[in-house]
Structures are given as structure tokens and as C-alpha cells.
Amino acid sequence: MSLIDIQNLTIKNTSEKSLIKGIDLKIFSQQINALIGESGAGKSLIAKALLEYLPFDLTCTYYSYQFDGENVSRLSKYYGHTIGYISQNYAESFNDHTKLGKQLTAIYRKHYKSSKEEALSKIDKALSWVNLQSKDILNKYSFQLSGGQLERVYIASVLMLEPKLIIADEPVASLDALNGNQVMDLLQHIVLEHGQTLFIITHNLSHVLKYCQYINVLKEGQIIEQGNIDHFKYEHLHPYTEQLIKYRTQLKRDYYD
């Protein structure tokens, strides 16, 4: 069953050039779904379109958009407690003049009616998931942490809300190999054991083949191939997909992607 089903998604710029060209996309419930492709293909644009985060100079249209079996016009009301978003711009998620403990507590209590103690308990649990300890984080400011630490705090801030769907745009790109694999193991555990759904945009093809159940391949704004992991491991593939999987490298990113 698909958690998100969007038909004929098109994204255009002010010159009416189509950046995303009428794609059909399903995100399957309780699975790790992946979107892969070269830089500039439009992967991050799709994630932002799903969340209504597109830049003002881009327009988005679609024929139909369903979330959990219901037609929706806006997903913003689901953001946070139902849909979590892990973006590439984690450094912009926290201010520099408030301690992280206070910021995380405010985020949690914005979405759930809870005491400060209950919020801190959820925060502590989420930080432990990303291999951090509350005593090392909560009394610090964001600028006192390394980039890798801050990204893990950001991931924890999404996970602590226990969203039904997590949309993750390069969630481990700034982490070292060990912490990156640990975070991917954690995300896999959340999907398998707690029934959550993950839609991941990544350049790491090794992670895709190891963790994902369903894969979408994007090229120049069009989805050229879709299928479950067995299709990508054992069946004849589009030449472009074969090339991506053959190299299994992290592809270069650009401004939009």
C-alpha cells in the first residue's frame, strides 16, 4: 500500500521550462523508498514539492495527490508529528543564541502537549539513537558542536516526534562512514520494527542497494525506472540505471540538487 501517491507531478520555472516532467510517484508504506539520479536531475525538487517547500520562482502542478489514501491539497498541516523532513541544510535548523536543550524541548512541545520532563525524556531517547548523550548536547549552543554532531542532533529532532513518514534528503552526507552507517541502520530499524516509512534521496548507491526496498531512478526530470530491490539486483535494467549502480559512488551535487 502506498502512503503517498502523486500523479503527473510537474515543476516549472518562470520561463515555463519543465524541471520535473509529469512524473508518477508512489511512496510505499512501511518501506525504505529511494530516489536516485545524477546531480541536476531534480531529486531535491521533488522532495520540496511534496512538502510545499519549493522556491517562489518555481510552480508545481499535479493531477492527483493522495496521502494515506486520502486526497490532499496541502501537506503542511501534517509536518512534524506525521511527516518528518531531514534536509541537507541542517545547520540552519538551530539558532546560535539559545541552548540546544531549550530549542529541542520547544520543538517537541510545539507538536505534542507534554511536560518539560516528558519532552526531555523523548529528546534523550532520540539523541541516544544517533549515538549522542544528552549531557554532552543539551547545555551547548549549536556553534559549539562539530558539523557531524549537529547533523545528528538535527536527525534526532525529527526522530523524537516519531513521524509516520520521514522524507530524508541526503541524511548522512556530512557524516563519516561509521556514523553514516549507524544512522542508516537506525532508520532501517525504525521502518522494520516500528512501521514507519522512509523516502530517501541519496547519491550513495551502496546504501540504496543495502537498505532500500523500492527504488525510483530520475534522469533529467523524468522517472525512467521504478521497481523493488529484486528488480534492480536481478533483472535487466535501463542502461542509465546500470551505469549508476556500476559505479556506486557519491555523485556530485549542485545548487538545486
Swiss-Prot record:
Task: Domain (ABC transporter): give its ranges.
Answer: 4-245
Under the heading SUPFAM superfamilies, the entry gives: P-loop containing nucleoside triphosphate hydrolases
This enzyme catalyses: Ni(2+)(out) + ATP + H2O = Ni(2+)(in) + ADP + phosphate + H(+)
Tell me how this protein sits in the membrane. Peripheral membrane protein
Cell location: Cell membrane
Q: What is its EC number?
A: 7.2.2.11
Which enzyme class? translocase
Query: Superkingdom of the source?
Result: Bacteria
Report one GO cellular component.
plasma membrane
List ligand-binding residues for ATP: 37-44
User: Which InterPro entries does the record associate with it?
Assistant: AAA+_ATPase (IPR003593), ABC_Ni/Peptide_Import (IPR050388), ABC_transporter-like_ATP-bd (IPR003439), P-loop_NTPase (IPR027417)
Q: Name one Pfam family in it.
A: ABC_tran
Please give the family membership noted in the entry.
Belongs to the ABC transporter superfamily.
Q: What does this protein do?
A: Part of the ABC transporter complex NikABCDE (Opp2) involved in nickel import. Probably responsible for energy coupling to the transport system.
Fetch the PANTHER family from UniProt. NICKEL ABC TRANSPORTER, ATP-BINDING PROTEIN, OLIGOPEPTIDE TRANSPORT ATP-BINDING PROTEIN APPD
Q: Subunit composition?
A: The complex is composed of two ATP-binding proteins (NikD and NikE), two transmembrane proteins (NikB and NikC) and a solute-binding protein (NikA).
This one is known as Nickel import system ATP-binding protein NikD
Q: Which gene encodes it?
A: nikD
